C-alpha cells in the first residue's frame, strides 16, 4: 500500500470534518498505514465520524468514551465482543456504535438480517423495563398485542360483541355522543309551552336542553355523588350525564376563575346554567333464575309510544306529567309551570332546607344557601314575576330550535296526510314482496291493512315464508316478531283466522317499564298456542333462562321493526323464558323442543368457553406475579402404584372362597388354621360390624390415626399390637357368622371377581407397613404354631430372608 504525501493527509483530514463516514474511514486508513480498514461487523460505517475527530484532537481522544450513551450492560458487552482485534489501536475511539439510532438500526437490519437487534430486544424485554434506561421512543405495541386499524374497516368490538354483525353495523363508525346516549336512555320532563311534534315523529331527534325541567333516570342502583360519595341531595345532572349534589357542584365550580369548569369525571365542560334537576329511581335487575312478569304491549305503526294493551288509548297528543298510568312509557313528559313548581321546585327546596339545618355550621353551608337563592330565582321565573328577565333566553332558544328543525317539521306536517304509508315502506319491504304474490286488494286500503288481511286468502305460502324469516332471525340471536309475523299460524287455530286489521305491533315487555322484551322462541310458542300475539294473555310470568343485552342501531332497527320507537344507542335486552304447560301446552313445547334444546346447548357451550377463558386469564395473571400452576401427577395406575386395600380385599376374597369350599363355613378357630393362612387372616380388613365393635384393631387403627406413618412407627406399632391379634381373631368369627359373604363398600360382594376401587386413604406406605407386619407375625406367634406342629414351624423359620426387628433375640 503506497504512502500518501503530508499535503494529501492534511487535505483528507480537512475533508473528514465535512464529509460522511466513507471519507473519514478512507483518510484514517491512508494517514496510518499500519492500521487496516474497519471491519463491517463492528457497526455501520456512518458512525465513524467521531473517531476521525478524536484522531485530530489528540488531547481529548482519551475522554471521548465518557460520552457514550446509557445502554444496558449486557448489550455493551455484546457490542464490545464483536469488535475486531484491529480496532485496539490508540488512534481509534473505543466508544461503541449507537445501535439505538435510526441509521444503525436500518444498517443492521439490512446487512445482518436484523438478528442482532432481535436478540438485544429479546434480552431487554425479558427483564423489567425499569432496570434499563435504553434508547427513547421504543415502540412497545407488540407487548400489548395492539395494532392500528384503518378507519374504513369495522372492528369486532362494536354493538353486542358479534364480529359478523359488527361488520354490517353502519352506525358503529360514528363517534360516541354523550348527549345522544343520555337522551336515549332517560326520560325528560319538559315545559309544555313548546312544540315537540318533531320529537314524536323521529325518535333520534335531540331535545333542546333549555326546555328540560327534570331528568328521570331508571337504574339498577342508586347513584352517589362523586364528590362527597353520598346519595345526592337536590341532585343536578350535567349535559354529559353525571350526577352531583347541588351544593357540591357549586363548590366545585367556584374553584375555577372561569365561568365554566371541567367535569370531574369525563373532563367535559360544565356550565352552571346547564345543570338540570334529576331524579333516579331504582329498578330491579333481573338475572337468570328470577321470575319475571311481562305484559302485552301495543303500538301503532308510525307512533313512538307503546302502551299496554289493557291500558290502550289513542295517542293523539303527548303524555303529560300527571298521567301516572302511561307516564312510564313515554320519553317526553309535558309539564305545566304549576306542575314544575309543585313536583320539582318544592321538593328540591325541602331537601336543601333539611341539608342546611344539618350542616349550618360547616363551610359547606354557604354553597347550600347559594343553591337556595338560585332555586328562588327559578321559582320566580316560573311563577311569572320575572318574565322579562327569565323568558328571553327561552324565546331565543326556541327560535334557534325551530330554525334548525324546520325541514323535519315540514316532513312531520305532511306525514299524517299520507297515512302511515311512507313510514312503513322503509321497514316492511320484505313483507310487501310476499304479499304482492296474492290477488290484488282494494286501493282504498292502506299498505298496512294488506299485510294484516293477506293471511286469509293465502295462509300457506305466507306462513312458510314468515316461518323461514323467523328461523333466520332466531339463528342470528336477534329480536322478536310482531303482529304481521305472528299471524302466520292460523292453520292450527282456524277459529282465530279472522284477525283485526289495525296496523299495530304487539310484543311483550317487562311490567315495570324496563326495556326487556320476549325472545322470538317464546313468541313462536305463544303464537302456536293462541294463534297470534293479539290473542295471547295480557300478562305472563315465567323463569328467566337467558338475558341478552343490545344497543339500538340502524341494523338492529331493521331487524326488529317492532322496536323502531327506541332511539339510537338505547340499551335493551331480550329475555328467553321457560314457558310451562299452564301457559302453553305440552304439544307446543314438543314442537319447539329442538329449538329450545339447541339454544340450551349453545348456552352450555358459551358457559364452558367463559370458564376456560377465565382460567386462562387467571393463569396469565398468576404468571405475571410469579405463580405457576402446580404439576399434577396422576397416581391412578394400580400396577405402578398398588393400593394396600385392593390387595387385602383380593386375598380376603380368595381366602373366603377356599375356606368356604373346603370347610363349608367361613369362621374357624385360629388354632385349626395353618400359620400362613393365620397370618393372611389377621391382615384382612374387618367387616363393618367388627370394625365398629373393635376400633383397636391394628389395620383399622393405622388407617384412621396415621394414614402416612413413618418407618419407626411401623415397627413400633407392629410390635405393640402383635400380642393382641390372637385375642381379636375370635371376635371376627363371631361377627361374620351371620352374612355368608360380606358386602363391600361399593355394593358388591367379596366373592365377585371385580376388585373395588381403593379409597383415597390408601397409600404406598400402608402397603409397606403390611409387608413388614406380615414378616413379623410368624416370630410372634411361635407358641400357637408349636402346638400344631413343631417341625412345620421350623421349616417356616428357614424361609425368613430379611427382618428389621431388633427384638428377635430368641
Swiss-Prot record:
UniProt feature, compositional bias: Low complexity: 1-31, 104-113, 662-674
A GO cellular-component term linked to this record: nucleus
Region entry Interaction with MEOX2, spans: 101-185
Polar residues bias spans: 76-92, 652-661, 801-810
Basic and acidic residues composition-biased segments: 607-623, 722-735
Residue segments, region Disordered: 1-119, 598-623, 652-674, 722-759, 775-810
Family named by the database record: Belongs to the RNF10 family.
Complex and partners: Interacts with MEOX2.
Protein name: E3 ubiquitin-protein ligase RNF10
Source organism: Bos taurus (Bovine)
